[in-house]
Amino acid sequence: MSDRITVEGRDGAFGAYIARPKILRAPGVVVLHEVFGVNADIRKHCDELATQGFVAVAPDLFWHQEPGVDLSVTSESDWQHGLRLNQAYDRDAGAKDVKDTANAVAKLPECSSEVAVMGYCLGGLMTFLTAARYGIDAGVAYHGGDTEKYLGEVGGLNAPLLMHLAEEDEFISKAAQAEIKAALAKKPNATVYSYPGQRHAFSRNNGAHYNAAAATLANGRTRQFLYQQLRSAERTSSKVQV
């Protein structure tokens, strides 16, 4: 079941999409969008997580600039719109919004209080930043652009972190990927997977670079990671068809 909720953050209230599993008192996952806002792809990711036994919530990261952004990945004008929003995005304020969302999800009556954060592209970066700055129960980052610029904060990373990188990512150079891998290799709680031959957003549903085999592999690793790191997830998953 999907719906909209309002998150009361420290800097104001903002909207979020929520997908609930059939079995409640389930662990939560905060799903962070790309530069396209809470669009059809992000909502589909939330819906899929709900079928796997998670309370999935996608906050509107761009609410400070333009609430309710919902852009198409196939429209050039929407691409340019999203890139402009991304360039003006306040990542420091955004990390606070993500943490506030995680706190709000943990308090939902349908949530078991355990909450992971998972993001794509911009959302992948924000997953890393939130984990390093504020702490979360677990994090999953898909091809987080500009992560290499914040590796000086890796010392604050104590939560389990799973990161997926596309080896041929046109937005994350091979040199940047090497820096990310080297920095996270020092953290026993961090795992980085690389996907040979894959380009940016290979797991985006119906995206130009979507690769079914790589996406299935990455998403399977993510699901297993979430089941392992969120203690109540295993109990919930035993009652849910995955």
Each predicted region: which residue ranges?
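N-terminal cap/leader regions of alpha/beta-hydrolase-fold enzymes
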Residues: 1-242
